[in-house]
Amino acid sequence: MIAAADVKALRERTGAGMMDCKKALTEANGDMEKAIEYLRKKGLATAAKRAGKVASEGLVHAYIHGGGRIGVLIEVNCETDFVAKTEDFRDLVHNLAMQVAASRPEYVAREDVPEEVLAKEKEILRAQALNEGKPEKVVEKIIAGRLEKFYQENCLLEQPFIKDMDRTVQDLINEKIAKLGEKIVVRRFVRYEVGEGIVQSEE
Protein backbone atom coordinates (compact mmCIF):
# COMPACT_ATOMS: atom_id res chain seq x y z
CA MET A 1 0.00 0.00 0.00
CA ILE A 2 1.41 3.39 -1.03
CA ALA A 3 1.15 6.05 1.70
CA ALA A 4 -0.58 9.31 0.79
CA ALA A 5 2.29 11.23 2.43
CA ASP A 6 4.76 9.59 0.03
CA VAL A 7 2.60 10.50 -2.96
CA LYS A 8 2.45 14.11 -1.73
CA ALA A 9 6.23 14.22 -1.14
CA LEU A 10 6.91 12.82 -4.62
CA ARG A 11 4.56 15.36 -6.17
CA GLU A 12 6.33 18.21 -4.37
CA ARG A 13 9.73 16.97 -5.56
CA THR A 14 8.78 16.40 -9.19
CA GLY A 15 5.76 18.56 -9.98
CA ALA A 16 4.04 15.49 -11.51
CA GLY A 17 0.31 14.79 -11.15
CA MET A 18 -1.09 12.90 -8.14
CA MET A 19 -2.10 9.78 -10.09
CA ASP A 20 1.23 9.70 -11.94
CA CYS A 21 3.06 9.88 -8.61
CA LYS A 22 0.96 7.04 -7.18
CA LYS A 23 1.64 4.88 -10.25
CA ALA A 24 5.38 5.69 -10.12
CA LEU A 25 5.61 4.67 -6.45
CA THR A 26 3.68 1.46 -7.18
CA GLU A 27 6.03 0.63 -10.08
CA ALA A 28 9.04 1.39 -7.85
CA ASN A 29 7.70 -0.63 -4.87
CA GLY A 30 7.67 2.50 -2.73
CA ASP A 31 11.29 3.49 -3.50
CA MET A 32 11.25 7.31 -3.76
CA GLU A 33 14.41 7.67 -5.88
CA LYS A 34 13.33 4.96 -8.34
CA ALA A 35 9.91 6.62 -8.56
CA ILE A 36 11.58 9.95 -9.40
CA GLU A 37 13.64 8.20 -12.11
CA TYR A 38 10.44 6.61 -13.48
CA LEU A 39 8.73 10.02 -13.65
CA ARG A 40 11.74 11.66 -15.27
CA LYS A 41 11.72 9.05 -18.01
CA LYS A 42 7.96 9.43 -18.40
CA GLY A 43 8.24 13.21 -18.42
CA LEU A 44 10.95 13.18 -21.04
CA ALA A 45 8.89 10.82 -23.17
CA THR A 46 5.88 13.15 -22.86
CA ALA A 47 7.96 16.13 -23.98
CA ALA A 48 9.46 14.09 -26.81
CA LYS A 49 5.96 13.18 -28.10
CA ARG A 50 5.38 16.87 -28.67
CA ALA A 51 8.69 17.24 -30.50
CA GLY A 52 6.86 18.94 -33.36
CA LYS A 53 5.79 21.81 -31.11
CA VAL A 54 8.08 24.82 -31.39
CA ALA A 55 9.81 26.08 -28.25
CA SER A 56 9.26 29.76 -29.02
CA GLU A 57 8.51 31.18 -25.56
CA GLY A 58 11.14 31.62 -22.85
CA LEU A 59 13.43 34.19 -21.31
CA VAL A 60 16.38 36.40 -22.10
CA HIS A 61 18.35 36.74 -18.87
CA ALA A 62 21.23 39.07 -17.97
CA TYR A 63 23.76 38.06 -15.31
CA ILE A 64 26.55 40.30 -14.01
CA HIS A 65 29.41 38.77 -12.02
CA GLY A 66 32.58 39.93 -10.25
CA GLY A 67 31.45 43.47 -9.51
CA GLY A 68 30.71 44.20 -13.15
CA ARG A 69 33.77 42.50 -14.64
CA ILE A 70 31.86 39.67 -16.35
CA GLY A 71 28.46 39.88 -18.05
CA VAL A 72 26.31 37.20 -19.67
CA LEU A 73 23.19 37.41 -21.83
CA ILE A 74 21.42 34.11 -22.48
CA GLU A 75 18.21 33.10 -24.27
CA VAL A 76 16.48 29.87 -23.21
CA ASN A 77 13.26 28.76 -24.90
CA CYS A 78 10.29 26.65 -23.77
CA GLU A 79 6.89 25.93 -25.33
CA THR A 80 4.52 28.12 -23.28
CA ASP A 81 4.48 31.50 -21.58
CA PHE A 82 3.09 29.74 -18.49
CA VAL A 83 6.26 27.66 -18.02
CA ALA A 84 8.47 30.66 -18.86
CA LYS A 85 7.02 32.45 -15.82
CA THR A 86 7.56 29.59 -13.35
CA GLU A 87 10.20 29.84 -10.65
CA ASP A 88 11.65 26.50 -11.81
CA PHE A 89 12.29 27.80 -15.33
CA ARG A 90 13.64 31.17 -14.14
CA ASP A 91 15.96 29.39 -11.72
CA LEU A 92 17.23 27.15 -14.54
CA VAL A 93 17.95 30.14 -16.81
CA HIS A 94 19.78 31.94 -13.99
CA ASN A 95 21.90 28.83 -13.30
CA LEU A 96 22.74 28.52 -17.00
CA ALA A 97 23.87 32.17 -17.10
CA MET A 98 26.08 31.55 -14.04
CA GLN A 99 27.51 28.48 -15.81
CA VAL A 100 28.44 30.56 -18.86
CA ALA A 101 30.06 33.23 -16.64
CA ALA A 102 32.13 30.69 -14.69
CA SER A 103 33.01 28.09 -17.33
CA ARG A 104 33.45 30.17 -20.51
CA PRO A 105 31.83 27.83 -23.05
CA GLU A 106 32.23 28.81 -26.70
CA TYR A 107 29.21 26.95 -28.09
CA VAL A 108 25.81 25.66 -26.92
CA ALA A 109 26.21 22.10 -28.29
CA ARG A 110 28.80 20.03 -30.17
CA GLU A 111 26.71 20.43 -33.34
CA ASP A 112 27.44 24.18 -33.18
CA VAL A 113 31.22 23.78 -33.45
CA PRO A 114 32.19 24.97 -36.98
CA GLU A 115 33.79 22.35 -39.25
CA GLU A 116 36.95 24.44 -39.66
CA VAL A 117 37.39 24.71 -35.87
CA LEU A 118 36.94 20.95 -35.53
CA ALA A 119 39.39 20.23 -38.36
CA LYS A 120 42.01 22.50 -36.79
CA GLU A 121 41.52 20.91 -33.37
CA LYS A 122 41.92 17.40 -34.85
CA GLU A 123 45.09 18.53 -36.60
CA ILE A 124 46.55 19.83 -33.31
CA LEU A 125 45.53 16.68 -31.42
CA ARG A 126 47.06 14.46 -34.14
CA ALA A 127 50.36 16.38 -33.95
CA GLN A 128 50.36 16.11 -30.14
CA ALA A 129 49.76 12.35 -30.24
CA LEU A 130 52.50 11.78 -32.83
CA ASN A 131 54.92 14.00 -30.87
CA GLU A 132 54.24 11.82 -27.83
CA GLY A 133 55.45 8.86 -29.89
CA LYS A 134 52.05 7.15 -30.10
CA PRO A 135 51.77 4.54 -32.87
CA GLU A 136 49.77 5.65 -35.91
CA LYS A 137 47.17 2.89 -35.45
CA VAL A 138 46.03 4.22 -32.05
CA VAL A 139 46.25 7.92 -32.93
CA GLU A 140 42.63 8.07 -34.19
CA LYS A 141 41.34 6.61 -30.90
CA ILE A 142 43.42 9.12 -28.95
CA ILE A 143 42.05 11.98 -31.06
CA ALA A 144 38.46 10.78 -30.48
CA GLY A 145 39.02 10.63 -26.72
CA ARG A 146 40.60 14.07 -26.57
CA LEU A 147 37.87 15.53 -28.77
CA GLU A 148 35.34 14.43 -26.14
CA LYS A 149 37.32 16.48 -23.61
CA PHE A 150 37.28 19.43 -26.04
CA TYR A 151 33.47 19.19 -26.25
CA GLN A 152 33.16 18.96 -22.45
CA GLU A 153 35.25 22.10 -22.02
CA ASN A 154 33.79 24.19 -24.85
CA CYS A 155 30.13 23.14 -25.27
CA LEU A 156 27.72 24.41 -22.61
CA LEU A 157 25.44 21.35 -22.63
CA GLU A 158 28.36 18.95 -22.07
CA GLN A 159 30.08 20.87 -19.28
CA PRO A 160 29.90 19.59 -15.69
CA PHE A 161 27.31 21.72 -13.87
CA ILE A 162 29.15 24.15 -11.56
CA LYS A 163 26.85 23.45 -8.59
CA ASP A 164 27.05 19.65 -8.97
CA MET A 165 30.07 18.43 -10.96
CA ASP A 166 28.65 14.88 -11.14
CA ARG A 167 25.95 16.12 -13.52
CA THR A 168 26.24 17.82 -16.90
CA VAL A 169 24.32 20.93 -17.88
CA GLN A 170 22.25 18.69 -20.20
CA ASP A 171 21.34 16.49 -17.20
CA LEU A 172 20.11 19.60 -15.39
CA ILE A 173 17.99 20.64 -18.38
CA ASN A 174 16.61 17.09 -18.76
CA GLU A 175 15.44 17.15 -15.13
CA LYS A 176 13.56 20.40 -15.77
CA ILE A 177 12.05 18.97 -18.98
CA ALA A 178 10.79 15.99 -16.96
CA LYS A 179 9.41 18.21 -14.20
CA LEU A 180 7.81 20.88 -16.39
CA GLY A 181 6.75 18.58 -19.23
CA GLU A 182 7.94 20.88 -22.02
CA LYS A 183 10.84 21.10 -24.45
CA ILE A 184 13.57 23.42 -23.17
CA VAL A 185 16.20 24.69 -25.58
CA VAL A 186 19.23 26.90 -24.97
CA ARG A 187 19.05 29.16 -28.01
CA ARG A 188 22.15 31.35 -27.66
CA PHE A 189 24.38 33.21 -25.25
CA VAL A 190 27.10 35.84 -25.23
CA ARG A 191 29.73 36.42 -22.56
CA TYR A 192 31.65 39.65 -22.00
CA GLU A 193 34.66 40.22 -19.78
CA VAL A 194 36.32 43.56 -19.04
CA GLY A 195 39.56 43.93 -21.02
CA GLU A 196 38.92 40.81 -23.12
CA GLY A 197 40.78 41.02 -26.44
CA ILE A 198 42.59 44.25 -25.55
CA VAL A 199 46.34 44.09 -26.06
CA GLN A 200 48.09 45.76 -23.12
CA SER A 201 50.80 48.33 -23.87
CA GLU A 202 54.27 47.34 -22.66
CA GLU A 203 55.00 50.91 -21.56
Swiss-Prot record:
Q: List localization entries.
A: Cytoplasm
Quote the InterPro entries the UniProt record gives: EF-Ts_dimer_sf, Transl_elong_EFTs/EF1B, Transl_elong_EFTs/EF1B_dimer, Transl_elong_Ts_CS, UBA-like_sf
Keyword hit for Protein biosynthesis: yes
| GO molecular-function terms, A-Z | translation elongation factor activity
Q: Which UniProt keywords apply?
A: Cytoplasm, Elongation factor, Protein biosynthesis
> What cellular component terms from Gene Ontology apply here?
cytoplasm
Q: What is its main location?
A: cytoplasm
- The leader peptide range reads none
Q: Which Pfam families match?
A: EF_TS
Q: Where is this region: Involved in Mg(2+) ion dislocation from EF-Tu?
A: 80-83
NCBIfam families for the chain: tsf (TIGR00116)
What family name appears in the similarity comment? Belongs to the EF-Ts family.
Q: What does this protein do?
A: Associates with the EF-Tu.GDP complex and induces the exchange of GDP to GTP. It remains bound to the aminoacyl-tRNA.EF-Tu.GTP complex up to the GTP hydrolysis stage on the ribosome.
Instruction: State the protein's name.
Output: Elongation factor Ts
Species of origin reads Moorella thermoacetica (strain ATCC 39073 / JCM 9320)
The encoding gene: tsf
